[in-house]
């Protein structure tokens, strides 16, 4: 977080980035899954219902084996992660909740959280997934 930017501005920027990211992520997951790994860092880790997948090749194989999906995000929360916790790397925590229907399966509730890091390119900043944790949610009896 740059010293010249007040915290509220920093939070607002993080929220705008998170909203844009969520739209891109779930549209890509549902419609262009082969491109999904482009949103991840090379050494990113996905935890899918307790199962870890790391690295671009393994992520690509994992996403290819999933049935087609229809995600509906109902809740989005985000917050910047303090730079002291991330060695001055601009990082945002994004949490989503909603429903998903995988082809051949019933609709289920899900919760997913992402740690996004800002990656500078020659003319802009691109947000990449460093960590992704997906869980199906079941109601407690």
Swiss-Prot record:
Subcellular location: Nucleus; Cytoplasm
Keyword flag Protein transport: yes
Signal peptide: none
Keyword Transmembrane helix among UniProt keywords: no
Domain NTF2, first and last residues per copy: 17-136
Keyword annotations: Cytoplasm, mRNA transport, Nucleus, Protein transport, Transport
InterPro entries: NTF2, NTF2-like_dom_sf, NTF2_dom, Nuclear_transport_factor_2_euk
Cited Pfam families: NTF2
Superkingdom assignment: Eukaryota
Gene3D superfamilies membership: 3.10.450.50
GO biological-process terms attached to the record: poly(A)+ mRNA export from nucleus; protein transport
GO terms for cellular component: cytoplasm; nuclear pore central transport channel; nucleus; perinuclear region of cytoplasm
Record text on subunit structure and interactions: Associates with NXF1, NXF2, NXF3 and NXF5.
Record function comment: Regulator of protein export for NES-containing proteins. Also plays a role in mRNA nuclear export.
Record-given protein name: NTF2-related export protein 2
Species the sequence originates in: Gallus gallus
Lineage: Eukaryota, Metazoa, Chordata, Craniata, Vertebrata
């Amino acid at each position: 977080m740059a010293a010249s930017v007040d915290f509220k501005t920093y939070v607002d920027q993080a929220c705008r980035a998170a909203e844009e990211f969520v739209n891109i992520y779930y549209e890509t997951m549902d419609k262009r899954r082969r491109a999904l790994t482009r949103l991840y860092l090379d050494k990113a880790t996905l935890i899918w219902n307790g199962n870890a997948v790391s690295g671009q090749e393994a992520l690509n194989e994992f996403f290819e084996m999933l049935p087609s999906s229809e995600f509906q995000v109902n809740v989005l929360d985000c917050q910047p992660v303090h730079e002291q916790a991330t060695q001055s790397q601009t990082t945002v925590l994004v949490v989503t909740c909603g429903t998903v229907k995988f082809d051949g399966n019933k609709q289920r509730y899900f919760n997913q959280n992402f740690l996004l890091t800002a990656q500078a390119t020659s003319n802009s900043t691109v947000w990449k997934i460093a960590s992704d944790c997906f869980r199906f949610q079941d109601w407690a009896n």
